[in-house]
């Protein structure tokens, strides 16, 4: 009898501990550099239970559950490394913490390699944007404050980030041209856009298997435009093209790529609206918030996102001064990052961090109304 009571008390205690571990748990919220591996190992199962409950995760059997727990433990250690390498941001448990880095890249990153990005680094491009004046640029600017940015969307388990970047840029351009913010269709790109880069005939837009924003704009010029999300809703999977030209709500007039110069990027952002950009997403799987400015980050681009603004007041604890940053809209839902947004540092001391300046394109829209 006493043994049974002791067992019940132990189970109740374990349940209470699990319930207490929630989104505000300091390890869940942020992997603290001062912790040790033994603490992570001892508490990993409780943190994993909280993670499963918070994000509604389910696994097919006990073996899969055990495997995902082991991946979760690896990602706790990885988030700690990211925290050490990127101290001005917060890194910790996200909804992707049960995925290996390879699974994450394969499922959520879909920006195809492009020779055009290399040409831009070398100052060459067939669609180079004209140089704009940069005197008098504001210290802070955010298109969300001016009505040109739609709601944060979720690409799901589909490498269609490029389509969200392209549609977001056209949403902003269409707003500047017409004064109306339309929520545009990414699924039209996924199903119907098979445009190839002229410099790389084998690199074509391929739905959930990846694509490029510039080739997406080329497709729209040929197709006539893009339908609304309402008329052509997102499914998160490759499907048969159902494009209806009579339902076009936004069309591309022209597009160009912006030089690898932060002042020019800022000037184009203000003049043309949100910009379609590529980025190295190496630190984004564990990102929770703050200004990301990792000491080490490659410039290999693997994720398409939308640049919507910039600021100058991101606090940098290492240098005890403000760190300027870009404001980036992502396509992983509002329960990632800062309500779906990412901040990454900019400025002369950190030029082109994670390749953020390497692939930037602007688009101009013409008005297209339903007949």
From Swiss-Prot:
The gene is CCP1. The lineage of its organism: Eukaryota, Viridiplantae, Streptophyta, Embryophyta, Tracheophyta. Its EC number is 3.4.22.-. GO terms for cellular component: extracellular space; lysosome. It holds the Pfam family Inhibitor_I29. Residues 19-136 form a propeptide. Gene3D superfamilies: Cysteine proteinases. Involved in the degradation of the storage protein zein. May play a role in proteolysis during emergencies. This is Cysteine proteinase 1.
């Amino acid at each position: 009898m006493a043994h049974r009571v002791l067992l019940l008390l132990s189970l109740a205690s374990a349940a209470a501990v699990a319930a207490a571990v929630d989104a505000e748990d300091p390890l869940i919220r942020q992997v603290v550099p001062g912790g040790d591996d033994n603490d992570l190992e001892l508490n990993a199962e409780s943190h994993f239970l909280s993670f499963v409950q918070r994000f509604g995760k389910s696994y097919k059997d006990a073996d899969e559950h055990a495997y995902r727990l082991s991946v979760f433990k690896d990602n706790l250690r990885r988030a700690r490394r990211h925290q050490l390498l990127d101290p001005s941001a917060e890194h910790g448990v996200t909804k992707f913490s049960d995925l290996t880095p390879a699974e994450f890249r394969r499922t959520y990153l879909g920006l195809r390699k492009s020779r055009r990005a290399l040409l831009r680094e070398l100052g060459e491009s067939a669609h180079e944007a004209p140089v704009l004046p940069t005197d008098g640029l504001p210290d802070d600017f955010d298109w969300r404050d001016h009505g040109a940015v739609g709601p944060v969307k979720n690409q799901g388990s589909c490498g269609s980030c490029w389509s969200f970047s392209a549609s977001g840029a056209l949403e902003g351009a269409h707003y500047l041209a017409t004064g109306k913010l339309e929520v545009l269709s990414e699924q039209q790109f996924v199903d119907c856009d098979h445009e190839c880069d002229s410099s790389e005939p084998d690199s074509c837009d391929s739905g959930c298997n990846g694509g490029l924003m510039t080739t997406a704009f080329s497709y729209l010029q040929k197709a006539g435009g893009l339908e609304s999300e309402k008329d052509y809703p997102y499914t998160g999977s490759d499907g048969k093209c159902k494009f209806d030209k009579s339902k076009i709500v936004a069309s591309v007039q022209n597009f160009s790529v912006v030089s690898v110069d932060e002042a020019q990027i800022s000037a184009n952002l203000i003049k043309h609206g949100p910009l379609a950009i590529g980025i190295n997403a190496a630190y984004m799987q564990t990102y929770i918030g703050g200004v990301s400015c990792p000491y080490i980050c490659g410039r290999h681009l693997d994720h398409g996102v939308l640049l919507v603004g910039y600021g100058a007041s991101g606090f940098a604890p290492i240098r005890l001064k403000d760190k300027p940053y870009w404001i980036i809209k992502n396509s992983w839902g509002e329960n990632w990052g800062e309500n779906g947004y990412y901040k990454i540092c900019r400025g002369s001391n950190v030029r082109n961090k994670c390749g953020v300046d390497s692939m930037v394109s602007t688009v101009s829209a013409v008005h297209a109304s339903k007949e």
